[in-house]
From Swiss-Prot:
Residues 27-77 form the bHLH domain. Residues 1-26, 128-153 are annotated as: Disordered. InterPro entries: bHLH_dom, HLH_DNA-bd_sf. This is Transcription factor bHLH47.
Amino acid sequence: MVSKTPSTSSDEANATADERCRKGKVPKRINKAVRERLKREHLNELFIELADTLELNQQNSGKASILCEATRFLKDVFGQIESLRKEHASLLSESSYVTTEKNELKEETSVLETEISKLQNEIEARANQSKPDLNTSPAPEYHHHHYQQQHPERVSQFPGLPIFQGPGFQQSATTLHPPATVLVLPIQPDPQTQDISEMTQAQQPLMFNSSNVSKPCPRYASAADSWSSRLLGERLKASE
């Protein structure tokens, strides 16, 4: 009895080992089929996820329709990417143009600031020059106005002439006299000299009032203009 027990136990161990070896060894055909089935299941899961992302209808849930929709979606995406690239290039060019314009505006503002500062300096200099100096004497216009207020009767005698009273103008109204006119009257009236005397008499009041100046009338030669030449010829003949 004792010798049989170890033999039976060894047989059972060998039987279990054989069963394990049989279970671990899988035929090649069965292993390939399992791998293909797993791949198909994985692809089916990927197609289902793609259909969910593309939001396709259940009627068009075939793999061909899913692939067509995916290609169309990718074309749209690539078109949007190209348009975005073009917009990016245009924005870069516009940004460079804006930077150049900004630099030009800065230069113009700097030039304007310098011009404004120069003009302010000129205005300040002119304002300082135009300030009255209390140590100097007043202007001749002030003396003229003051003299008109003090001596209105003298100013009324010479309304057309200015009167200046000051250090630079020591002229008074009493020293002004009308210029004397010399008239030459022949024995016989000469029309030429008569016209000259009439013109001098007509111009005499105009010398005091320059506002009433009239244009002289033209005079043409007449037969009386040869009187002086005839008289000289007769005198020469008598002297011979």
